[in-house]
Amino acid sequence: LNQIGLNVKDFASRAQEKKLLQNEIEGSTFTISNLGMFGIESFTSIINQPNSAIMSVGSIIQKPVIINDKIVISNTMKLTLACDHRTIDGASGSKFLLTLKDFVENPIKLLL
């Protein structure tokens, strides 16, 4: 995970400086579109060809939720997944979102 974090920082820095190499930005199969930092709660993205899917990430919003039969204020975030059904069926996309939800809610599981 540490190496992934270092790679992400490196790519982000070079992307902002417009110094990524062509081979580093082509050949993707999945796109993540994040408008959450602009306060957008949810949105639907259009799949970039030749990708198989795109995930839209909304802003983190505090809302009342029920935890252990009690109403508490908790951070929530909406994710939307659009899949090209020629390559990914809805059930597989749903399983992906459920797994991602579990990791976001329980990040310690990433280390197990």
Describe each PLM feature range.
Residues 1-112:
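C-terminal catalytic/motor cores of large multi-domain enzyme assemblies
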